Amino acid sequence: YNDFNTYIANIFHCSVFKRDQFLTKLKSYPSQDAGLFEKFKKDILPLKYGFKLGDIEKAAKYIYIETQTFSGMTISEKTKYVDLKGKYKSKYQHLIDKLENPKWQLKIGNITNVENESFETVIKKYDTPDTLFYVDPPYYKMEDYYTKEFGRDQHLQLANELKNIKGKFILSYYVFPQLSEWFPKGKYHWTTKEFSKANSTTSKKKTTSRGEELLIMNFKPALTL
């Protein structure tokens, strides 16, 4: 697993390799607390990348801030706390439950290494004829909703890198005009996949809707993805 956002990579590292200690730290905080939210924002901001993975305290604080907001996509001074007033189960508690779920533990248990590198570095390091890369970049023209490490020009750079690899790739995107130029349908395999996504709700009833993602591959899969 690789993520250029050090905080996200650190969360995965702690979840995989320090799960028990990480869960203990997460459970030591209340599921909602406005004061703690503001304190952790001051501790975390400004975001400083490149620290050594395995920092449980940074992982817990980052998750706490992310799960107390509406979008949970990027953290800044403008990030606002959302008070559920005890009416609904918090996203923070949902995340703890997920980390404790045996199915999730089995899933992330398949991760053997966590990297915090650029896509160029990872491709150069791992590319072989037997490698399969699953690539999930930020949405095109929505990079600012994430963090600042991946700019708009890097979408084209990523496309050029993928078109020249020895191995196989699955690229997750949504449709935008440049994609047909970068990955012509006659040369690359395009398919769509539905997924469930949680809706914002004002009731205790959990609701979901169906979303759709585009998958582009430099091979034709033997099975439907």
Question: Can you name each region flagged by the protein language model?
Answer:
Residues 12:
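Conserved SAM-binding loop
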Residues 141-151:
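Glycine-rich phosphate-binding "P-loop"
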Residues 9:
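Short alpha-helix immediately C-terminal to the canonical SAM-binding loop
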